[in-house]
Swiss-Prot record:
Substrate binds at N52, G53, G54, E65, N93, D94, S119, T120, S121, S124, Q172. This is Phosphoheptose isomerase. Its EC number is 5.3.1.28. It is found in: Cytoplasm. It comes from Pasteurella multocida (strain Pm70).
Length: 194
């Protein structure tokens, strides 16, 4: 009944993943992002993560695995997903949704922290504002984008881009794979100092 559609979906996902893997620069950027986060943790910094929709869930997933665990039992790492409903609804109502993440960064972010922002289009105004606020605070920025990187192209310290121009779900599938690899590398790196 749907076997061909199922196979086509999986084949498309594999094609997007293989294209991402075959760009050696992506491997270097993932390593660079993991080291940037690990260095922040070693110096007392934290990660603030944010995204919209499915990317918001990925931001929460990343923070949860940093504070909780990924594969190994180890001390928790300082991370906050900007997901507090009272904060989001307050700022959305009083200032506008484009400021929900930047207001939090202004309040909680410190020099040496890392902003981890996800946007499949690279054009999410609230993520762009968060990046601006993070830069003003002296924070480092890791951006996970898709397509051509949108307005986020070139403005982060590290941008990991999935150059897929179809539906956003394919981009998000690579983003979560990258998040899991980042977790593995961060755990490897932090184990050197624990």
């Amino acid at each position: 009944m749907y076997l061909e559609q199922i196979k086509a979906e999986l084949n498309e996902a594999a094609t997007v993943l293989n294209k991402f893997i075959n760009d050696e620069n992506n491997m270097k950027l993932i390593q660079q992002a993991a080291l940037l986060i690990s260095d922040s943790f070693k110096q007392g910094g934290k990660v603030l993560s944010c995204g919209n929709g499915g990317s918001h869930c990925d931001a929460m997933h990343f923070a949860e695995e940093l504070t909780g665990r990924y594969r190994e039992n180890r001390p928790g790492y300082p991370a906050i997903a900007i997901s507090d409903v009272s904060h989001l609804s307050c700022v959305s109502n009083d200032f506008g949704y484009e400021y929900v993440f930047s207001r939090y960064v202004e309040a909680v972010g410190q020099k040496g922290d890392v902003l981890f922002g996800l946007s499949t289009s690279g054009n999410s105004k609230n993520i762009l504002n968060a990046i601006k606020a993070a830069k003003e605070k002296g924070m480092k920025v890791i951006a996970m984008t898709g397509k051509d990187g949108g307005q986020m192209a070139g403005i982060a310290d590290v941008e990991i881009r999935v150059p897929h121009f179809g539906y956003a779900d394919r981009i998000q599938e690579i983003h979560i794979k990258v998040i899991h690899i980042l977790m593995m590398l961060i755990e490897f790196e932090m184990a050197k100092t624990e």
